[in-house]
UniProtKB/Swiss-Prot annotation:
Species in which this protein is naturally found: Arabidopsis thaliana (Mouse-ear cress)
Protein name: Disease resistance protein ADR2
Enzyme Commission number(s) from the entry: 3.2.2.6
Ranges occupied by LRR repeats: 533-556, 578-600, 601-623, 624-647, 649-670, 671-693, 694-714, 715-737, 759-782, 783-809
Subcellular localization, as worded in the UniProt entry: Cytoplasm
EC main group: hydrolase
Catalytic reaction equation(s): NAD(+) + H2O = ADP-D-ribose + nicotinamide + H(+)
Pfam family, one: LRR_3
Induction text: By UV treatment.
Keywords assigned: ATP-binding, Cytoplasm, Hydrolase, Leucine-rich repeat, NAD, Nucleotide-binding, Plant defense, Repeat, Stress response
Cellular component, GO annotation: cytoplasm
Domain-level remarks: The TIR domain mediates NAD(+) hydrolase (NADase) activity. Self-association of TIR domains is required for NADase activity.
């Protein structure tokens, strides 16, 4: 529902007062009126209106023509139905025309107003004695609402005159401030302001400092300016200090400089030019009795804060807001309340961009994909979205398509802003940032620390410094991945590219690298090479290409264009690699093995995906530092080397190594090995016992079609995936794997009966598209932690066993033979998906629908809404009477459009609530349906009409506010497909009251 408060209005009166005459008219109200006259405030005078049982039209008109409504709540206020009707009209105007409502509690406890208790409550009950329940309810809700509006409480004031002066000042502030429109188009701004106002705690008397921190270009200054615009009028003095970086460069101990800055600062706050201060302590004398709002924008050093923001200088109620890219500065200055500005959502980012590029909130026809691509390039950074949007304004689609390649690697208009944080770093932290950006983006913090252990950098401290300056983000999950924003990566690449050749530690320019490798012109200063071969044709590498790079730590050769089938680099067999290398990443390596001169004693990670390797190396290597081997999609690989010395190996990835026949027995004693990925190893027949791998948590053997036997596995295993194999059973030893959480055996066509007892720790089971015919009772119902069970496409499954109460998701779509449920569904929190299960018997259907009333959603075949839904209609809309309950069960019959592609599933269901009464208001919500269908399902299309049942609540504004402001008679619900991929044939609603009603509703359900 949209309020018209954003539209300018011509207000006839400044103030309307609602009061009970005998309580306040003679003394308090007369004094208040005199003060308003003194302050030039126009107040509506109701002396000429005769009071009656019904609020007069003239009074309604006056309320609607007043900018501010003051509700004077006294102990007998509720004894007047006139006053209570006035209150309803005031709240109506607040909601619909943006009227400002203020409260004064005159000799009455605010809690008595809210709860209608005490003498106030007695008066209210007497007034309600002969009224309808509807009238009583509206008045009660209105009093509760207005009682929660913070206002002046008479009991807290010793001097009534000062209280009245304060009220007059507050009214003056509210009516004299013209709303600033500068920030109306700032997407998501209100959310930021709400968080900041909460931190500022503007009602408290003490002095408070609050920080706003975040990366460059995120909108910190915009938020600060909006706060200044909105709240500066409530302070005696205010000051917005920007350009601190340029104008307030401060060095500790420069007394004269600090004194001059104090003079400028105080002059700006007090709006008095040419002020002279004799010493530094004078600033406190000038400001300590003044309530000030000070915003220090873009602070970049602790010295600036110490010089310009001491909390002891300012008067009670003062607030200081500090914006910075360095969170550590705020912490060092003792600022505990810090608002960290996050990136906008995907939809918000698109809106921000569109407002700059198209001057509208969404892309015009034909521009959606282009707009999405630019938003991706900007990685949701607001400054970049605005700058790039403006640069594309009023350009054609062809111009956009021509511009996109350049935009992917340019920083037009934002480079200087992004570089500030980087240039403020010391030399070692700059180097750390470049290493992370080029080689270790999205890697775990511990892995970054390990890889850079021999780089002479203080990595742990450096990571903290980079995170405090928002140059990196460290995820807060267990892995603690280090992430660099896309535009900062572009900046880092530009920095590396512009370095002098003899000083370059990191090579990233493809043409320069090609020359160095062909002519062997490297040098000892080079520590990292990141070579994107997408930018070159073919290259003959010199055998001595790396000979002079004696300090090389990181070598990364890859193809960002994913041209993995094209071998571009001719690698000589006798090439020599430095033994200092810690990262050896070479995609599509064309040699059959690494040269015999290769030494791996310093190697931490080897990553050679899509290679032509037949074997990694010959003989035995010293592998004490090796943590990871990734040879995925190396289709010629026939064997792995002896890994018995790789005692610290944690990750082994050989997925899609289709010629690999067996894994070496040497891996059986690698006690730190945690992850083994060997999916689609089509020739793999033998896996040695893994029982001694006490750290193993993840095992993927998907599509190892020749695998005859499930290997022995350790009790440490957490995730087992063996899809698309010929296995006929799971090992009984799984029972003892007390940490097992996920088991995926989809596509196991030879698996007929699922009877293996699993540990109670299991939370995810996927048996989809298997040959399963029967699931024994005991192997599922005792899994008290089971969250989701996927049986999609199990076409031979006839019956479901009893399921545990813990289940949240049951996917049984495309189970062609499924007829019955063994016992009642006792899954109070489960989403139930039975798409295309056309053989379900009546009892099973009844159980599914009944359970859906308790749990979340249900999808099952059906041609019509069950008659027990109290309100039903053909087509996509229906009208139901308004109810005090705000809980509903909704059923729609949907049918997939026949003209859509066969593999398409329903996507988004839109449904709109519209309340109908003496005013009409609407609200729309979206259900995302596509996730209900298993991606591995053989046939996910709805073959016939289906029932979709879901729980919904009336939007809060309709349920909590409108009923006591307007008379609501009916509610209309409309359903539609956002992408026109399905039709709504029927719809139905059941209003829910309490659990007893729900049981009664479905106790007699018949099909």
């Amino acid at each position: 529902m949209a309020s018209s408060s954003s539209s300018p209005r011509n207000w006839r009166y400044n103030v309307f007062t609602s009061f009970h005459g005998p309580d306040v008219r003679i003394k308090f109200l007369s004094h208040l009126r005199q003060q308003f006259v003194y302050n030039g405030i126009t107040m509506f005078d109701d002396n000429g209106i005769e009071r009656s049982q019904i609020i007069a039209p003239a009074l309604k008109k006056a309320i609607g023509e007043s900018r501010v409504a003051i509700v004077l709540l006294s102990k007998n206020y509720a004894s007047s139905s006139w006053c209570l009707d006035e209150l309803l009209e005031i709240l109506k105007c607040k909601e619909y025309i943006g009227q400002i409502v203020m409260t004064v509690f005159y000799e009455v406890d605010p809690s008595h107003v809210r709860k209608q208790t005490g003498d106030f409550g007695i008066a209210f009950k007497e007034t309600c004695a002969h009224k309808t329940e509807e009238e009583r309810s509206k008045w009660s809700q209105a009093l509760t609402y207005v009682g929660n509006i913070a206002g002046e409480d008479f009991i807290h004031w010793k001097d009534e005159a000062k209280m009245i002066e304060k009220i007059a000042r507050d009214v003056s502030t509210k009516i004299n401030v013209t709303p600033c429109r500068d920030f109306d188009d700032m997407v998501g701004l209100e959310r930021h302001l709400k968080e900041m106002v909460s931190l500022l705690d503007l009602d408290k008397e003490g002095v408070k400092m609050v920080g706003i921190s975040g990366p460059a270009g995120i909108g910190k200054s915009t938020i600060a300016k909006a706060l200044h615009s909105r709240h500066s009028s409530t302070f005696q003095h205010n000051c917005f200090v920007d350009n601190l970086w340029e104008n307030y460069k401060i060095c500790t101990g420069e007394h004269g400089v600090k004194l001059r800055l104090h003079e400028q600062f105080v002059s700006k706050i007090l709006k008095q030019n040419g002020l002279e201060l004799t010493h530094l302590s004078v600033i406190k004398d000038r400001l300590q009795d003044k309530k000030v709002l000070i915003i220090l924008d873009d602070v970049e050093s602790l010295a600036q804060l110490e010089t310009l923001a001491d909390m002891t200088w300012f008067g009670p109620g003062s607030r200081v807001i500090v914006t910075t890219e360095n969170k550590e500065i705020l912490q060092q200055h003792g600022i505990g309340d810090i608002y960290q500005v996050g990136y906008p959502s995907e939809s918000e980012a698109l809106t921000i961009f569109c407002l700059s590029a198209f001057k509208q909130a969404s892309p015009p026809d034909g521009f959606m994909d282009l707009a999405d691509e630019v938003v991706r390039i900007c990685d949701k950074l607001p400054l970049a979205l605005c700058v790039l949007g403006s640069s594309l304004l009023r350009k054609s689609q062809t111009d956009w398509e021509d511009e996109l390649p350049r935009l992917r690697n340019c920083l037009d208009g934002i480079e200087s802003v992004l570089k500030v944080g980087f240039e403020s770093l010391n030399e070692k932290d700059q180097a750390l940032f470049l290493y992370i950006t080029v080689f270790f983006n999205y890697e775990c913090a511990d892995h970054v620390t390990l890889m850079l252990a021999k780089s002479n950098l203080n990595v742990r401290l450096g990571l903290k410094n980079l995170a405090n300056r928002y140059l990196i983000h460290i995820d807060h999950d267990q892995k603690k991945r280090v992430v660099v924003h896309r535009l900062l990566r572009v900046m880092a690449i530009q920095v590396c590219t512009k370095q002098k050749p003899w000083k370059s530690q990191i090579l990233v320019d493809a043409e320069k690298i090609a020359y160095v490798l062909e002519e062997a012109t490297g040098n000892r200063s080079i520590k990292g090479v990141s070579f994107d071969t997408a930018e070159i044709d073919e290259l003959m590498i010199s055998p001595k290409a790396f000979e002079k790079m004696c300090n090389l730590l990181f070598l990364k050769v890859y193809d960002a264009g994913w041209h993995t089938g094209k071998r571009k680099l001719d690698i000589p067999e006798d090439i020599k690699f430095p033994r200092t290398i810690r990262l050896f990443h070479w995609d599509a390596y064309s040699g059959k093995r690494l040269p015999s001169s290769f030494f791996a004693e310093n190697l931490v990670e080897v990553n050679m995906q899509d290679s032509e390797l037949q074997k990694l190396w010959e003989g035995t290597q010293c592998l004490a530092n090796l943590k990871k081997i990734d040879l995925s999609r190396s289709s010629c690989l026939t064997e792995l080397p002896d890994l018995s010395n790789a005692t610290n190996l944690e990750d082994l990835y050989v997925g899609s190594c289709t010629a690999l026949v067996e894994l070496p027995s040497s891996i059986g004693n690698l006690h730190k090995l945690a992850h083994i990925m060997m999916y689609s190893c089509e020739s793999l027949e033998v896996i040695p016992s893994l029982i001694n791998l006490t750290s193993l948590t993840f095992l993927n053997m998907n599509k190892c079609s020749r695998l005859r036997r499930f290997p022995d596995i350790p009790t440490s295993i957490e995730d087992v995936q063996v899809t698309g194999t010929t296995l006929e059973e799971l090992p009984a030893s799984l029972t003892h794997c007390s940490g097992l959480q996920t088991i995926k055996i989809s596509g196991s066509v030879n698996l007929k009966i699922f009877y293996t007892e699993l540990p109670v720790s299991v939370s995810h089971i996927n048996i989809s598209n298997s040959g399963i015919e029967w699931i024994t009772e005991d192997c599922i119902k005792g899994l008290h932690n089971l969250h989701d069970l996927c049986l999609s496409g199990c076409k031979r499954l006839v019956s479901l066993p009893e399921l545990p109460r813990s289940l949240k998701i049951l996917q049984a779509d495309d189970c062609d033979s499924l007829e019955s449920l063994n016992g009642h569904l006792n899954t109070p929190n489960a989403e139930l998906y039975f798409a295309n299960c056309f053989k379900l018997d009546a009892e099973a259907r009844r159980a599914i629908i009944q359970q859906s009333f308790v749990s979340g959603w249900a999808l099952l075949p059906g041609l019509e809404v069950p008659p027990e839904f109290g309100h039903r209609a053909r087509g996509n809309s229906l009208i139901i009477p308004y109810s005090a309950s705000n809980r509903f069960k909704v059923c729609v019959v949907m049918s997939l459009n026949h003209h859509q592609p066969f593999e398409l599933v329903p996507r988004n269901l839109l449904y709109r609530w519209t309340v109908i009464g003496d005013s009409v208001s609407s609200d729309e919500k979206t259900f995302h349906l596509s996730h209900m269908f298993n991606a591995d399902s053989v046939n996910s299309k709805l073959q016939k009409p289906h029932l979709f049942i879901f729980h919904s609540c009336l939007p809060f504004i309709f349920h909590s506010c409108l009923p006591f402001i307007f008379d609501i008679s009916n509610i209309m619900l409309e359903f539609s497909s956002e992408y026109k991929d399905f039709d709504i044939l029927e719809c139905g609603v059941q209003i829910l009251t309490d659990e007893t009603d729900e049981r009664n509703i479905w106790g007699s359900l018949v099909f």
